[in-house]
């Protein structure tokens, strides 16, 4: 979880992105011929990963915070080069991957690490998320000391020229899909039929095996038909058609109510019915006619000898290779991530002016709420071209109001939940903090239901997907209603991230993050897992009592809370049968409002405080927002 920055954890979802680069109207610095351009790409691997607002004084090739990721060939005598060499980079949705593209006029066909003898032509700095969001990104090159700027409609060429970056997934995830059933399986239960399921295992060269896929359990049958199976061929057999694949058939033994362990432990006492070995090529022969595979139980075979035939038969049919749309397919097709945030203003946070309060505003260090907000927003902003967010507060009394608001717009100045950019969210938060009375209780259901109503309007296509971030310091007061709301929203284009701040015991909150089993209440079961919960305190220090740098905290926190989002989005789209729009005909991308400043928004600097709302100002009313007053609990 707290791995070194820039080192990829093999367990995290990763996609390789291939970048192709061209440039136009470059400066001509040669006297008797045109420039001979070469493009180098760098990634910032240490220090703060935010776009700089100051002039760059140290050449990137000398700056130890930047690591070269590759370089193109030199294109001789050309001001409009189309470089043939491409860059292959790992892409992580949950990370800020800050890149620099720098073009030099090479003074020789061979360019070494020292670039001091080569003329600088231009630079563009951006995060990888910007590139993959547009698929094709064009930008003005910046002069020496500048970082350039993204090309806008109606822009004209500048003296430094422009760069165009094309991004595409290097390789699509290939899966084998097939139907499978069993016939005549051995009976393992004394008083009833077996409860069979299948394990598909990869076999490695050293003979060891690893579980790749498990089917559902089919109760009380010796002739089961399981749901259609889909398995990644790279994971199953490294796409090797002749590599052995192990299939195991087990009879599941039920546990007594309240005794069933979590995770794979609940399969620990199951009885083996039989095993078989096959290959990808053999499975694919089931594309036309059914493939029959005999299950063998070695213990039973040794006991019965020649009388033993098999322990049942597996039949596989409708086999085919499928390539499913990926997260980047949807993003490149214009799918936008709408983002909403809800901040806990209950009294248990402590008086904001007290240094022990979780809302305390220090002059030199952001509080935990600010860290959580910036951590998630700094990633998600690149997937919403409008640069606007919805921001709410909950559990406070607003100015001139007697009742407690279970949900209110964070921007008290304008009385609206819509704010522009990260700066707008942070400014609205600080302003609200100085104008509301912290109260209680901690109710999540009104927030979830409000955002779910918005997500309900997104169900007709793949254009938008909603993410809700809730930051809280305590135990939920309306757990039953919250679970009901989450289950009701589980079929919507919605992911919910909950970050617990402070030192409260959040054990019950883990019930909402149903990684082992889908969330259930009475007879209702969630359609999918849409909640990710983490506690902030796990990220604040290095394990030796020393607080980490805020930038490191934000990076590690974002990595943990956001990595499930791509799978949740693609899982929803698959469930609804939605396909991504073509890259050359994407969903419409809204432009940010005129007041949005991308440079200021990326710095993290504190914006000026908003003024208090005028006397008699009426705040908007949301459904079911007023709750019974409870005394503050500091």
Curated annotation (Swiss-Prot):
Give the residue ranges for region: Disordered: 576-603
> Where is this protein primarily located?
membrane
Q: Where, in this chain's numbering, is Ca(2+) 1 bound?
A: 30, 36, 105, 107
Any idea which positions bind Ca(2+) 3? 189, 195, 251, 253
Tissue note: Expressed in head and tail neurons, ventral cord moto-neurons, body wall muscles and hypodermal cells of the vulva.
Where is the C2 domain positioned along the sequence? 1-141, 159-295
Q: Which SUPFAM superfamilies match?
A: C2 domain (Calcium/lipid-binding domain, CaLB) (SSF49562), vWA-like (SSF53300)
Instruction: Enumerate the Pfam families for this protein.
Output: C2, Copine
The annotated subunit structure for this chain is: Interacts with nicotinic acetylcholine receptor.
Family named by the database record: Belongs to the copine family.
Q: What is the protein's given name?
A: Nicotinic receptor-associated protein 1
Supply the source organism for this entry. Answer: Caenorhabditis elegans
Q: Which gene encodes it?
A: nra-1
């Amino acid at each position: 979880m707290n791995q070194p920055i820039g080192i990829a954890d093999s367990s995290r979802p990763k996609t390789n992105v291939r970048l192709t680069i061209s440039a136009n109207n470059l400066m001509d610095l040669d006297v008797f011929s045109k420039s001979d351009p070469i493009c180098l790409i760098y990634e910032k691997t240490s220090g703060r990963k935010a776009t700089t607002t100051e002039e760059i004084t140290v050449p990137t090739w000398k700056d130890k915070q930047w690591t070269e990721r590759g370089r193109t060939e030199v294109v001789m005598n050309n001001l409009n080069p189309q470089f043939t060499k491409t860059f292959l980079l790992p892409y992580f949705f949950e990370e800020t991957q800050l890149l620099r593209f720098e073009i030099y006029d090479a003074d020789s066909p061979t360019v070494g690490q020292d670039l001091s003898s080569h003329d600088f032509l231009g630079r563009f700095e951006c995060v990888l998320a910007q590139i993959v969001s547009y698929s094709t990104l064009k930008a003005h090159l910046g002069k020496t000391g500048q970082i350039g700027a993204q090309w806008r409609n109606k822009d004209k060429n500048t003296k430094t020229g422009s760069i165009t970056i094309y991004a595409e997934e290097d390789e699509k995830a290939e899966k084998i899909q097939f139907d499978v059933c069993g016939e005549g399986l051995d009976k393992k239960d004394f008083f009833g039929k077996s409860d069979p399921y299948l394990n598909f295992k990869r076999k490695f060269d050293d003979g060891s095996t690893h579980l790749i896929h498990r089917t559902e359990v089919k109760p009380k049958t010796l002739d089961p038909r399981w749901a259609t199976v889909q398995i990644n061929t790279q994971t199953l057999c490294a796409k090797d058609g002749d590599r052995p694949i192990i299939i195991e058939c087990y009879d599941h033994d039920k546990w007594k109510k309240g005794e069933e362990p979590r995770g794979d432990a609940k399969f620990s006492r199951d009885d083996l019915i039989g095993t078989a070995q096959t290959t990808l090529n053999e499975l694919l022969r089931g594309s036309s006619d059914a493939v029959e595979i005999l299950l063998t139980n070695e213990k039973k075979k040794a006991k019965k000898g020649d009388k033993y035939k098999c322990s049942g038969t597996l039949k596989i049919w409708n086999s085919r290779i499928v390539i499913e749309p990926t997260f980047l397919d949807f993003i490149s097709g214009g799918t936008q991530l709408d983002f909403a945030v809800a901040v806990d203003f209950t009294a248990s946070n402590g008086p904001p002016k007290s240094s022990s309060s979780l809302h305390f505003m220090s002059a030199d260090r952001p509080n935990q709420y600010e860290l959580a907000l910036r951590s998630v927003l700094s990633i998600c902003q690149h997937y919403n071209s409008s640069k606007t967010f919805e921001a709410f507060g909950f559990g406070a009394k607003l100015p001139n109001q007697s009742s407690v608001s279970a949900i209110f717009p964070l921007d008290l100045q304008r009385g609206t939940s819509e704010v522009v950019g990260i700066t707008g969210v942070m400014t609205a938060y600080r302003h609200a903090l100085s104008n509301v009375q912290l109260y209680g209780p901690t109710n999540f259901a009104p927030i979830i239901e409000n955002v779910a109503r918005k997500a309900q309007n997104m169900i007709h296509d793949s254009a938008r997907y909603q993410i809700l971030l809730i930051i809280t310091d305590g135990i939920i007061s309306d757990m039953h209603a919250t679970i009901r709301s989450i289950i009701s929203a589980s079929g919507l284009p919605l992911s919910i991230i909950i970050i617990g701040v402070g030192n409260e015991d959040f054990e019950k909150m883990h019930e909402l993050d149903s990684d082992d089993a889908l969330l259930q209440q009475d007879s209702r079961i969630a359609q999918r897992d849409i909640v990710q919960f983490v506690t902030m305190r796990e990220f604040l220090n290095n394990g030796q009592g020393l607080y980490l740098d805020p930038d490191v905290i934000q990076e590690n926190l974002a990595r943990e809370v956001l990595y499930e989002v791509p799978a949740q989005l693609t899982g929803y789209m698959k469930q609804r049968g939605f396909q991504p729009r073509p890259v050359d005909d994407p969903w419409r991308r809204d432009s940010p409002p005129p007041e949005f400043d991308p440079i200021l928004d990326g710095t993290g600097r504190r914006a000026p405080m908003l003024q208090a709302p005028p006397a008699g100002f009426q705040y908007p009313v949301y459904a079911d927002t007023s709750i019974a007053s409870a005394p503050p609990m500091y």
